[in-house]
Amino acid sequence: MLKNIACFGVAGNFTGHLEQAGEAESFSSVKTSEETEPKAIFPTFIPSDSKNVPDFLKIFPFSSEKIIYPENETKLQIEPECAVLFNAEWKDGKLKNLFPLSFGASNDCSIRKDGAKKISEKKNWGKETKGLSSNMILLDDFSENSKLYDYRIASFLLRDSNVFEYGENSFVKNYNYIWKKLTLWLIEKFNSQKDEGPKENIHEYLKEASFPEKILVSIGATRYTEFGERNFLKKNDEAVVVLYPDSKYCEEEIIQKVKQRDFSDSEISFLVQKICEKKS
């Protein structure tokens, strides 16, 4: 199903993440209406054969089980996020509205790559290079009244039988832009974002994808813990991202579930990915 859906991410929707990721300088020339506004939308997958879409963006990158380690790169990090799947309403070639369908844990896995001109160049390096949970939770409202209001994002690195907290445990409601404010911002950027600096012309990509009925958006990465900021992924690690209801579980209970590999509760969106070498 996802292979027919245009997929995007949001840069700079948690204060401090871009600085930790070493990307703040790339966005230094990007003008925003207020300090907390995200910097840009970036593409991760465009379902199109058009020559106007870069070839790497035509490759479906999502997996719920593994991440293929990039060749000739060593600085690879988990980007723990909440992903939201929307129905898209179009009129006369413009996006008019977005209606939520489901949400889940996402790993917008990224290479810390010097010299990349566009954000997307650090995001998709082939098949099985990004993460999306197989347990997407139904969502009929994207507001303070929705079930998502109660959810938190947690992330972990599993290495040598140890569990390390990778991203700061954060409420979804604490994104800089969320609910209606984020929805309106997304619609504006999908229609009008220009090809400038690290940004790309998103509307042109959507046009080449024949104005898709559904759009997946990973709405921003949390800040890293001190461990997450300093430690890159290695082969045979496992990357874990969890979206869980705060009213039902505390952080320690989630850590225990990860340690015990108890991923059974359908109210929790778990994403567990093994870091693997590319098969020759």
Where are these regions (language model features)?
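Loop/turn positions that initiate beta-strands
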Residues: P212-K214, L233-E238
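Short, structured beta-strand/loop micro-motifs enriched in basic residues and often containing a Trp
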Residues: K199, E213-T225
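Catalytic nucleophile loop of clan PA
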Residues: F227-L233
